[in-house]
From Swiss-Prot:
Main location: cytoplasm
Protein name, entry field: Polyribonucleotide nucleotidyltransferase
Required cofactor(s): Mg(2+)
Binding residues for Mg(2+): D487, D493
Enzyme Commission number(s) of this protein: 2.7.7.8
Amino acid sequence: MNPVRKTFQYGNSTVTLETGRIARQATGAVLVTMDDTVVLVTAVAEKEAVPGRDFFPLSVHYQEKTYAAGRIPGGYFKREGRPSEKETLTSRLIDRPIRPLFPDGFMNEVQIICTVMSANKDVDPDIASIIGAAAALEISGVPFQGPLAAARVGYTDEDGYLLNPGFKAIENSKLDMVVAGTEDAVLMVESEAKELTEDQMLGAVLFAHQEMQVAVQAIKEFAQEAGKPKWDWQAPEVNAELLEALKAKFAGSIGEAYGIRVKADRYAKLGELRQQAEEELAGEEEGKFEAELVKKYFSKLEKACVRQNIIKGEPRIDGRDTKTVRDLKIEVGVLPNTHGSALFTRGETQALVTATLGTMRDVLMVDALEGEKKDSFMFHYNFPPYSVGEASRVGGVGRREIGHGRLARRGVQALMPNLEEFPYAVRCVSEITESNGSSSMASVCGSSLALMDAGIPVKAPVAGIAMGLVKEGDSFAVLTDILGDEDHLGDMDFKVAGTEKGVTALQMDIKINGITDEIMEIALEQALHARLHILGEMNKVISEPRDSVADNAPKMETIKIDPDKIRDVIGKGGATIRSICEDTGASIDIDDNGTVRIYAESKLAADEAIYRITEITAEAEVGKLYRGKVERIVEFGAFVNILPGKDGLVHISQIAQERVENVTDYLKEGQEVVVKVLDIDARGRIKLSMKEVTEDEKASMAG
């Protein structure tokens, strides 16, 4: 073994890349260490592509092992199960900047596995994983146009931009952004922010790109020392004869088809033309071409036609110019029994979004490497096949749905009230009922509307918009509110969510090199105008949260009790609190600091539960009257229960005005009496009196 190591300083972190010691049979393997977080990243690539394959089979698997944090997994089998949401999102985060750096026509299967083997609880392993994946590919010899690196950026008013902040620093930051890029260009941005300006967001991207050059250079030097010989791979030759034949016969017809505004009709016409091209140009005789090749080149021609029209300044596929948002239709309160609902339609993209309130028992428990966390805000995104007019498998949640749900959640997260202001668990669900471009941003708009419809005190309305780019040479066009086809045929997917004040989420994926600062600035500016337009239309329907939550939402009351009394409220084995919940129908949550939250279907039920709790936790007060029950009679008096678990002594001399010879002549066990507290001694013993209670006081207690 001849291990090769490269160590470099990356902000406040020390990063070490190592290869040649572990996983030596992989095409490329790098062990990345970043402040005691250790990630093993392997890249394995097929030497030959499967004949006839027409897609690039890249798969990225990020996995966290519980032993990395010194823990044994839960569950019956005590081993890691299916990928968590964090693992799925990080897999996508690694995939997105890597995918565009493989050359066109490379169809060999590539699999990247990132395994977190040691975890520093303040360091997110995602940056180390992206750096490791880039380094593993760079030394593997696989055709790859790297190296690339990644950086996390935070922002505070006091310190400005922060490079690779840890979890603790992010808690106090107004920004959590991950940027990946090469020496020359930014390829991917993923972020959430607390209403930062467009200039601040762009500044963060440029700051990250500048700072990551240290890592890019380190990977380059590492590959020079440890890299394998580059593969002798040649891109497939362009079949100029087929391309010219397709242009001559179908370019005009394709252009006309893309003038059809309705997506289904447009797809039907393009399908007819594709079929016609196969019939005319595919076959085994001389001068004909393979059917799959005809389909492939027909798609290339489609892309070229649409892109040229946009660059020339001609109307887009649906007739809009580059800055116009599609027609909007906005409704709230569309579902009668949900706590909040909205139907947001933008052109042929539609999201039906609901907001549901729950108790603190409904919060999501997240078992992460850095420790267990409670998540009181959940956002789930569903993309059924009917939304694009298809009939296909309906099954579990896919990576795409998890990713889109997290992006939409980021858009509204910063505007959600904290638990002190609004102690409810909240779940938003976005059902995509139609899709033709940027359903995730429709989900942001719909969720903002649904949350306000539910009476949840969000700080401001939020809207989202997707931008696109077509770039040919030095000419480019930035597109507002892209269609699905424009996303597929374009060079950039740029999604921005925010309020009137600033940006709350920014996601960017770039498929080409050469995206300039100017292009990003124009995209952010156009997105701002589009966002303000959408917010204006949303505000016409609902501009602030409703005054109260829905009638069928849980009613919540909060009281404080002495923390020492918590055990009394819970009771032996939970018997007392269970009895209160069963009798009143309420749900009760108690924090360690004595905060008690009561959730009930009606205020009457909540008040009854509060009364029961205050009875249990109440302390006797000197001079106060109580209605009590005689529990036990002794020679010198009687013990009377005045509060749950609280008995006091009525001395024989305090039973009546006259002299009492026998207590049993005046009192019986189980008898209800009105008493006054005379004194409470240092040991908590309560002295009671019956004779000090006046007739008027007795009457008031009876009423």
